C-alpha cells in the first residue's frame, strides 16, 4: 500500500492516498501504522479520499464538506475517528499540492467539522480557516501532578485549554487527563498554556486518542482563544515543542498559519503489521 509521511510543527501523520475510497481502514490498521516501533510511527493517519467516494454521511457541521473535491479522513493514533486536525489539514494540503491533485494556491478541504479554506502562502507556510471557535464555559481536569482549570472550547473538536502560572515544561502530561464525563462526553484534548511575552504563548497538549504530541493545531487555536478576552480580536504566536504557529482571531473565527512538509513516500506491507 502506498503511503507518504509528513508533519506540521512535528505533529506527524501517515498519509494514505485513496482517491476512490477503496481502502478498508479499520482501527487496528490505523493503530498498527502509527506504532513507532513496529509500524511507520505517527500521531495519526490522513486518508486522502474524494468526497464523492466517501462511505459515510456528511450531516450537521460536516455538511459543507460536500462541496469539496477532497476529504481529509483523519484518524487518531489509537484508530478512533476524529472531527478535525489543524496541523493535519496543513499537511493534507501540502500533500495535495505536491501530488498534483490541486492547481490553485487557495482551495477547500473537506473535514468532519465542515469545509476548511486553505491558502498556500508565498513564504511556504499554509493558512487554514479554522472556522468558528465556540467558548463553552469553564471546565477542569486532573493531570498526573494535580488538578487544572480552564475553558471548554470547540474548534470542531473538543478542548480544555488551561492557563498555568508555571512554565509548561514543568507540567506532568505523562498520563491521560481525567475529565468529567458530563463536561466531555466524548473526551477532549487538554492544553496547558502560559503567556511568555506580549502576544506570545507557550503550550503543550495531551491529545485525545494519541497522548502528548509535539503540536496540535486545533489545540493551538483553543489556547489562543482561551487567552483572549471575551469579544475581542487578537493575534497570537503560539510556541509548542515542535515549533510555532500564528493564530488570528476575528469575529469569533480563527485562522491558523504554520509550516507543513512531506518527508517521505513509499510502500508499506500491511501483512507485516498484523
Swiss-Prot record:
Pathway(s): Amino-acid biosynthesis; L-lysine biosynthesis via DAP pathway; DL-2,6-diaminopimelate from LL-2,6-diaminopimelate: step 1/1
Catalyzed reactions: (2S,6S)-2,6-diaminopimelate = meso-2,6-diaminopimelate
Top-tier EC class: isomerase
One Pfam family from the record: DAP_epimerase
Keyword terms of this UniProt record: Amino-acid biosynthesis, Cytoplasm, Isomerase, Lysine biosynthesis
Active site: 85, 216
Record GO biological process: lysine biosynthetic process via diaminopimelate
One Gene Ontology term of the molecular function aspect: diaminopimelate epimerase activity
Compartments, as annotated in UniProt: Cytoplasm
Function of the molecule: Catalyzes the stereoinversion of LL-2,6-diaminopimelate (L,L-DAP) to meso-diaminopimelate (meso-DAP), a precursor of L-lysine and an essential component of the bacterial peptidoglycan.
Subunit: Homodimer.
Protein name stated in the entry: Diaminopimelate epimerase
Lineage start: Bacteria, Bacillati, Actinomycetota, Actinomycetes, Streptosporangiales
Gene name, Swiss-Prot/TrEMBL: dapF
Amino acid at each position: 500500500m502506498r503511503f507518504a509521511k509528513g508533519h506540521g510543527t512535528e505533529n506527524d501523520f501517515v498519509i494514505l492516498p485513496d482517491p476512490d475510497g477503496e481502502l478498508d481502514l479499520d482501527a487496528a490498521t490505523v493503530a498498527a501504522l502509527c506504532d513507532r516501533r513496529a509500524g511507520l510511527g505517527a500521531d495519526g493517519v490522513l486518508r486522502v479520499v474524494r468526497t464523492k467516494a466517501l462511505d459515510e454521511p456528511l450531516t450537521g457541521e460536516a455538511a459543507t464538506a460536500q462541496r469539496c473535491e477532497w476529504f481529509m479522513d483523519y484518524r487518531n493514533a489509537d484508530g478512533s475517528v476524529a472531527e478535525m486536525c489543524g496541523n493535519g489539514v496543513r499537511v493534507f494540503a501540502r500533500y495535495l499540492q505536491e501530488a498534483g491533485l490541486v492547481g490553485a494556491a487557495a482551495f477547500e478541504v473537506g473535514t468532519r467539522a465542515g469545509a476548511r479554506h486553505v491558502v498556500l502562502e508565498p513564504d511556504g507556510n499554509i493558512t487554514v480557516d479554522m472556522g468558528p471557535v465556540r467558548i463553552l464555559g469553564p471546565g477542569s481536569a486532573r493531570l498526573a501532578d494535580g488538578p487544572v482549570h480552564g475553558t471548554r472550547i470547540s474548534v470542531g473538536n473538543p478542548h480544555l485549554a488551561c492557563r498555568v502560572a508555571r512554565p509548561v515544561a514543568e507540567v506532568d502530561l505523562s498520563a491521560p487527563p481525567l475529565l468529567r464525563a458530563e463536561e466531555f462526553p466524548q473526551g477532549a484534548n487538554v492544553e496547558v498554556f502560559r503567556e511568555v511575552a506580549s502576544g506570545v504563548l507557550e503550550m503543550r497538549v495531551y491529545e485525545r486518542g494519541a497522548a502528548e504530541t509535539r503540536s496540535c493545531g486545533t489545540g493551538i487555536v483553543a489556547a489562543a482563544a482561551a487567552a483572549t478576552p471575551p469579544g475581542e480580536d487578537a493575534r497570537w504566536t503560539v510556541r509548542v515543542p515542535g515549533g510555532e504557529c500564528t493564530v488570528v482571531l476575528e469575529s469569533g473565527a480563527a485562522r491558523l498559519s504554520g509550516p507543513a512538509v512531506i518527508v517521505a513516500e513509499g510502500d508499506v506491507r500491511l501483512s507485516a503489521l498484523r
